[in-house]
Amino acid sequence: MDSKKRSSTEAEGSKERGLVHIWQAGSFPITPERLPGWGGKTVLQAALGVKHGVLLTEDGEVYSFGTLPWRSGPVEICPSSPILENALVGQYVITVATGSFHSGAVTDNGVAYMWGENSAGQCAVANQQYVPEPNPVSIADSEASPLLAVRILQLACGEEHTLALSISREIWAWGTGCQLGLITTAFPVTKPQKVEHLAGRVVLQVACGAFHSLALVQCLPSQDLKPVPERCNQCSQLLITMTDKEDHVIISDSHCCPLGVTLTESQAENHASTALSPSTETLDRQEEVFENTLVANDQSVATELNAVSAQITSSDAMSSQQNVMGTTEISSARNIPSYPDTQAVNEYLRKLSDHSVREDSEHGEKPVPSQPLLEEAIPNLHSPPTTSTSALNSLVVSCASAVGVRVAATYEAGALSLKKVMNFYSTTPCETGAQAGSSAIGPEGLKDSREEQVKQESMQGKKSSSLVDIREEETEGGSRRLSLPGLLSQVSPRLLRKAARVKTRTVVLTPTYSGEADALLPSLRTEVWTWGKGKEGQLGHGDVLPRLQPLCVKCLDGKEVIHLEAGGYHSLALTAKSQVYSWGSNTFGQLGHSDFPTTVPRLAKISSENGVWSIAAGRDYSLFLVDTEDFQPGLYYSGRQDPTEGDNLPENHSGSKTPVLLSCSKLGYISRVTAGKDSYLALVDKNIMGYIASLHELATTERRFYSKLSDIKSQILRPLLSLENLGTTTTVQLLQEVASRFSKLCYLIGQHGASLSSFLHGVKEARSLVILKHSSLFLDSYTEYCTSITNFLVMGGFQLLAKPAIDFLNKNQELLQDLSEVNDENTQLMEILNTLFFLPIRRLHNYAKVLLKLATCFEVASPEYQKLQDSSSCYECLALHLGRKRKEAEYTLGFWKTFPGKMTDSLRKPERRLLCESSNRALSLQHAGRFSVNWFILFNDALVHAQFSTHHVFPLATLWAEPLSEEAGGVNGLKITTPEEQFTLISSTPQEKTKWLRAISQAVDQALRGMSDLPPYGSGSSVQRQEPPISRSAKYTFYKDPRLKDATYDGRWLSGKPHGRGVLKWPDGKMYSGMFRNGLEDGYGEYRIPNKAMNKEDHYVGHWKEGKMCGQGVYSYASGEVFEGCFQDNMRHGHGLLRSGKLTSSSPSMFIGQWVMDKKAGYGVFDDITRGEKYMGMWQDDVCQGNGVVVTQFGLYYEGNFHLNKMMGNGVLLSEDDTIYEGEFSDDWTLSGKGTLTMPNGDYIEGYFSGEWGSGIKITGTYFKPSLYESDKDRPKVFRKLGNLAVPADEKWKAVFDECWRQLGCEGPGQGEVWKAWDNIAVALTTSRRQHRDSPEILSRSQTQTLESLEFIPQHVGAFSVEKYDDIRKYLIKACDTPLHPLGRLVETLVAVYRMTYVGVGANRRLLQEAVKEIKSYLKRIFQLVRFLFPELPEEGSTIPLSAPLPTERKSFCTGKSDSRSESPEPGYVVTSSGLLLPVLLPRLYPPLFMLYALDNDREEDIYWECVLRLNKQPDIALLGFLGVQRKFWPATLSILGESKKVLPTTKDACFASAVECLQQISTTFTPSDKLKVIQQTFEEISQSVLASLHEDFLWSMDDLFPVFLYVVLRARIRNLGSEVHLIEDLMDPYLQHGEQGIMFTTLKACYYQIQREKLN
């Protein structure tokens, strides 16, 4: 609260705010007095009951005054001064309310408190007569799970009930009576219940009368509306009926359902069981009689009306009797809703009527102007207008066809005045004197009783025999009661047919929901819902029936009601247009008018000049706060007046039928009025320093401004839009846009006016003014409107309107002058109309002026002063800016009037404005022809070069202007550059050159910034740049360039050429999106080319250079092929992968390898999926040429020569069973020539062979069978030759490594500068990061950190050490982890080609040695790259000396000597390519490599595994004995889970368990070094286990160690131990072989072979 006090109250002191003045109701002359005993606290809100009141102060405290019988102490029952409600101390109360004898308050945390009389449960406490202190009311939503406490926003209290509005905009009720809106017969209701009928709707406010309730509800958005059903959901009867009589047709929407509410589908189940009382029959008879009345002849009118009168009287008597009996159940209630298209039918009937409009000039007052149909349209129609209209048309057509044309003459001869009948039927009796509360004079004492009125009306009805002009009906606002039997009309079918053909222009001027504004400001799209007792018509439904549930008062739809007040037995509704509708009891003139009936809302006649902005309703009087000329609110009183001495008023004149202005201007500025039973109260502010006066001025002028805008909209804009032949489509669209923007602005002003009224009721902090906090809403709306109206002006809209609108304007000239505030009678109509349309812009000056006034009320240093000052400047600045926009539009319009007509049509655009042209500023084209005419016109969006009848338009966004230097010979020259043109303009003088250059530069700058319609908020003038940027974003369509003809480019430009990111689209569907450089595609981009033949498109994503594909990219062909790899000059060049077809297609295949000029050349792998073959070898001109290897899925292996895609020349062929042919080939798998065929058993044939392998081979040669005594060493000599005819490992994938060297800036391996290589790496990383930033794939935090760390180049100064070696190792790990780094890209590619080669068909055991050689080649070539980047790195096999001795020494496992680095031949770290790179490379290549090892060792592994399974069946003791382990090494006891257990003969898998577990880890490691460490750790675990059992130090010998290690290997059960052994052997560093780890590895290898030879006895 401190901040609130510090704000605007500092300017004038809080003691001058919220002063309380109180009057006695009806006492004249008025004697206002200060509230007795009240101190100086500022009161924000007051509420009055019958004999008590409640005050809410600024600091959230609540005081009670008056008679308080519920208080416990006898002294406090009637205190002399207001007393503080101590129970609420500590709570910050935000609102209070009072009923007749109880009170309520709501705290800022949404808790409602009630106290006072509780006889009807109105305080939500059970079985308690009084609630002496404020008691919190527990309100919980039972539908929510778990139960949630409902937070309350507002309370309203009646005599016996209370309503609470929750923060979720739902109504909760408790107390007694039908006014609760709950379906229950058990009263009182002491537990708050939700009013389900309004659940799901947004309720804005609730109000309570004595026994009725009102709710202000926001209209449903149009998308939520459901179509109107044809039939009632309850009784399935038609909602609209048509009755065909002899000479007329009756259309009726008089259908009604029980309970007086229209039940929706969702409520049908809940309420279907409600019983109907016998009185429903009476009402049905009334309806029947009423229909008969409408169709009666003149002679029978009186008889029928008397019958109706009798029915009404009997009905009233019945309901009065029910009230006397005190029954709580309402036996009969009716809801007869208006059909949504009532007004549409009215429209038809208005056109049929030939009668003139009869204006009611009673009391000499000006009649309410007839409002157009659409202004009165109901906002929440349950169906779209088109649907409703079509439904109506179909109904009309059916009517017309039902009766003959001859009926028309009978009908048109005469009919009954529908209006008069409805007037008489609407008059309903007052409530009885008992219920009328304090009314001294009962209904029986009134001279003009209801019965008398019925008789008078029936007599008038007898005289009337003319067709009522339906427009007259509309003139009387609200005379039709839409909730009674409504649309009962007699319609001539002939005229209906005629009317059905009439087409009117549909104009919607109600703005749609505007999101932000609707969230910040009060909504004007509201409905009024009422329920409870209606004996005095206080529900507004046109009858005196009670309603158990809320029912919408349809005739208030579209009236923009913003506030409701409920008196004892009457109701008031305040609209945004400062009008008040009133209905209900008018016994004392409390409605502010004397019109009948009072059962429907009618306009109160308070002040003809001033609008109402606040209202209050007492028991039998009303109060109206009105705007006056000096902005000080005036207070009008209407209602009961206590006769003073000497007054001889008749009994029925105890009230004021006309509101009386109370003279209370001396009090100050009234901010709020509150009414009770016998007294009313006003909260008054003193005008210190003019602050309050300025606030009232702002609010008053805003409300008046809204009324004026509403009048313009309804009386000028809508009629104009409905005119025919308004000109071209563009003009009509522009006018409709003007109307739409005007309507939006008008609605915003209405909302703001309503919010200012609420603002004046509150704390009145300047900083919370919407016009300050959300100024952009207003600034944008005014700017949008100004844009649309100036566009309309430029296109000559007002001139085009002149002809079709002349009649309308002439008839309404006086109205036009009045609205536009033009006093000169000689002003032309079009000028007046122009002035009228620009009228709203003037309001901005008013905002600025009032905000400046408010600012002067504060200290200059205060934030309020600064904010008000800034906002004032903003509004003033916008007003001036929009004024300039208007002048620009008028200047442009004048230019178009003089411009040649043919070119005008193509150049004239709504948003185009003229800046300058060369006819008045001499400018010529350099080197122009002698007789040529060149006219240059500068618009805000283009420079136009006109020549005779032709012209060319240069958009400013892609135009560059620069002055020519004097050296170039152009003293007065301007160089103009556009994407496809470059020309020089010569001005007559240097001054002209400067003017043109400045004009063009500013225009280009404005076009680029899009500021043509944006106001320079917050500054005095627009800050123009000296020159527009050379680099900019723009869109352009090429028209000359052959390559780009008709293509459209949208993106970045630099000096007339595309440069930067952009999108280029060709008319034939081609599109490039990516980077440009100097007008050409350059950098990363995406290219699409449609393939019309295949109805697909080619798609390329990758790098470009100088307009051509160059670098890495992916090309997806329309045929389904995909190429990923390198490009050069739009051709595949370098390393790449081509996928052809899919597995399901006719010829799926895959090639990965080198390309040269779009053809396969060099080494590559081709996988023919259809034939199940894989070729790994050399290519030339797209064919296999040179050495290569082929493997098939059937196990065939060929290596040798290829020529033109065929096996031709020497080669070696192996089959799955190890049959080998080595010799000459002539075709694929075709032997031809000399060779040797070797059988699996070693027998071989030498000679000449011919034929295809697998289909019979002719042999001419010698068969050899080797001697039994020949050595086994010579048998596999052919296997040792494998690989000799394959491509050497170092020749494979050269293109991949060459690409990496190229990325580092080297022409060949090692040929380049190191610093340049590092620069290229940094550029590659930065570029890749930028591309990834724009791509949908977002890098993770760790990836981003890795990239950032890679941008730092490792610096090494001084001697090379282990630490520096470790830095390089860490850098390589990071670099190889990210494909954005050249090394990472290399590794990723190598992994891809390796897998491609050795997976699938390539998983052939014959390829193992090739695979191993390939890895070793990778290591050698990558190591070369690393040594180039880190020149200080020693050569392969060099030793790095240790900088310090190892901190802990251990004994050598093998020798027992103390050794720090027994693996190395000398102390230090040995540098090897495998040691540095295998940890990076091998984990990625491990799966395919290990698979080859497993395939190659398959037979050995099977024998080994069989032995392992067999030997592992034995218990530990038996196995140790069998393997020959010395007894001293047998564990005697074992520690299991900390418990020592003896080793039994049956114990299994327990001995040396830790060593076994350790050795099993060998399968989880990748590199030989890691596997060797596991082996070493296993030996150490064995040693630890033996030491624990021997309790003494010892030295292993191999005889002791081998059996124990053999036991561990067996128990470890490693499935592919042979593969592990061979992998280590092939890839381990040679220097390790003779060290400790080498010996341990040899031991493991020996165990592997030993296990295969073990036999178990």
From Swiss-Prot:
Annotated DH domain residues: 690-885
Residues of the PH domain: 901-1007
Residue numbers carrying N6-acetyllysine: 533
Transmembrane annotation, as ranges: none
Keyword terms, alphabetized: Acetylation, Amyotrophic lateral sclerosis, Guanine-nucleotide releasing factor, Neurodegeneration, Phosphoprotein, Repeat
Per-repeat ranges for RCC1: 59-108, 109-167, 169-218, 525-576, 578-627
GO molecular function: GTPase activator activity; guanyl-nucleotide exchange factor activity; identical protein binding; protein homodimerization activity; protein serine/threonine kinase activator activity; small GTPase binding
Residues modified to Phosphoserine: 465-466, 483, 492, 1335
Cellular component aspect of the GO annotation: centrosome; cytoplasm; cytosol; dendrite; dendritic spine; early endosome; glutamatergic synapse; growth cone
Superkingdom of this protein's organism: Eukaryota
Stretches assigned to the VPS9 domain: 1513-1657
Residue ranges with Basic and acidic residues bias: 445-455
Region (Disordered): 432-480
Single Gene Ontology BP annotation: endosomal transport
Subunit structure: Forms a heteromeric complex with ALS2CL. Interacts with ALS2CL.
Protein function: May act as a GTPase regulator. Controls survival and growth of spinal motoneurons.
Medical condition linked: Amyotrophic lateral sclerosis 2: A neurodegenerative disorder affecting upper motor neurons in the brain and lower motor neurons in the brain stem and spinal cord, resulting in fatal paralysis. Sensory abnormalities are absent. The pathologic hallmarks of the disease include pallor of the corticospinal tract due to loss of motor neurons, presence of ubiquitin-positive inclusions within surviving motor neurons, and deposition of pathologic aggregates. The etiology of amyotrophic lateral sclerosis is likely to be multifactorial, involving both genetic and environmental factors.
Protein name per the record: Alsin
